[in-house]
Amino acid sequence: MSRMNYVFTSESVSEGHPDKLCDRVSDAVLDTFLAEEPTARVACETFATTGRVVVGGEVGLSDPQKLDEFMERVDGIVRDCVKDIGYEQQEFHWRTIEVQNFLHRQSAHIAQGVDKDGAGDQGIMFGYACRETPELMPAPIQYSHAILRRLAEVRKSGQEPDLRPDAKSQLSLRYENGKPVEVRSIVLSTQHAHEEQTSDDIRAIVEPYIREVLPEGWITEATEWWVNPTGTFVIGGPDGDAGLTGRKIIVDTYGGAAPHGGGAFSGKDPTKVDRSAAYAARYLAKNVVAAGLAERCTLQVSYAIGVAKPLSIYVDTHGTGQVDAAQIEKAVADCMDLTPRGIREHLNLCRPIYARTSAYGHFGRAPEADGGFSWERTDLTDALLKAV
C-alpha cells in the first residue's frame, strides 16, 4: 500500500533560466518551420553562454531552396526570444549577443523510416494524472510553476521593475491521507536589479504573489521561507550559467512525482515520439482520471524506430482503480490510434504551438483555441467508459 502521510518536493524554473531560454529558442525555431510546412522535420538544439547563443541540429522542408531561406531567419528568431524573455544586461543583451547557426538538413536514413509513418526513434514515454489539483496534476510542480509564471507577469508588466528573468522555485508540501494540506517550505531564488538588495528586500517583493497563488490555508506559521538564501543574485541567465536545450525534463513534466522515459521535448517536431507519445500518454492518463476510472494513473508506451505501432502499453492506477488495469490498457488502445501518425492527427500536433510550452510545464495547462495544449483535453472520457 502506498504511503498516505509524507512530504514531497518539486521545483520549477522560469523562462529566463539558461536551460529554459534554450528550450524557448529551440521551440521557436520549430514553430517557424511548422508555420511554413506542417510536415517540416526539426530537431533543434540550443546552447547559451555569456554573449553567445549557438543553434544546431537537423531540419527538413520539402523545398530545399526554401530551407536555405529559412536558415537565414534563425538569427532573428533567437534575438526575438531573448528580447521577449527580457535579457538586456551588459553581457547578455538581445541586440549584442553573437548568434551561431549550425542547423543542417535531416539525415535521409532517419527520414526514410519516419516517412513510412514509423516512430522517429525507439524509446519509452510516460504519462501521469492525479486528483491533487483541478488540472489533474501533482500539486508541488503545478504550484511551483504558478509562482514563477505570476512573477514573470508582474516583471514584464513593469509592476515589479526590480525583478529580472532568471528564477527558480521549489515547494515541499505535506500530505495527509494522500492529499496536500500544507506548505512545509518555500524556496524562491530570483535574479534582481541591485546588488544592495537583501534577501529580505526580495522576499518583500515576491511574498504577496506567492501567497496569492497558493491555496488559502496552505501557508502556516510553521512554513519555512528561503528567498534568495545565498544573498545577491544580480548576475544571472546565460551570463551566470550556461544553458542547453532539454536539461529540465522533470520540470517539464511531473516534478518527479511520476516516472520519466528520459527524452526531452523542446526543439523536436511531432514525428519524434519523445514528444508526441509523451503528450499522448498524458492525454490518456488524464482522461482515465477524469472519467473516474482511477484517482491516479501512470501510463507507459514504448516504440521502435521505423515501427508504427507501440510495442507495449502499461497502466498502473496505484491501487485507486475502479476497474482492472488490464482493462484500461485495452481501452486506451481501442480508443486512440497510438501510431505516430495517429497521435499527430488525434491531437492536431503539426502546427506552430510549441514555443508556449517551453516554460512553466508542458502539462497542467489549459487547452487553447488554436490547438495549443490539445493533450490537456478531457474529451475521451465517454469512449473510455464505454470501452471498459
UniProtKB/Swiss-Prot annotation:
Entry cofactors: Mg(2+); K(+)
An MF annotation (GO) of this entry: ATP binding
EC id: 2.5.1.6
List of residues binding K(+): 45
Biological process, per Gene Ontology: one-carbon metabolic process; S-adenosylmethionine biosynthetic process
Subcellular location: Cytoplasm
Cofactor binding note: Binds 2 divalent ions per subunit. Binds 1 potassium ion per subunit.
Recorded GO CC terms: cytoplasm
Ligand binding (ATP): 17, 166-168, 241, 247-248, 264, 268
Keyword Metal-binding annotated: yes
KW Cytoplasm (keyword) present: yes
Similarity field: Belongs to the AdoMet synthase family.
Function text: Catalyzes the formation of S-adenosylmethionine (AdoMet) from methionine and ATP. The overall synthetic reaction is composed of two sequential steps, AdoMet formation and the subsequent tripolyphosphate hydrolysis which occurs prior to release of AdoMet from the enzyme.
Name of the featured protein: S-adenosylmethionine synthase
Taxonomic source organism: Cereibacter sphaeroides (strain ATCC 17023 / DSM 158 / JCM 6121 / CCUG 31486 / LMG 2827 / NBRC 12203 / NCIMB 8253 / ATH 2.4.1.)
Lineage: Bacteria, Pseudomonadati, Pseudomonadota, Alphaproteobacteria, Rhodobacterales
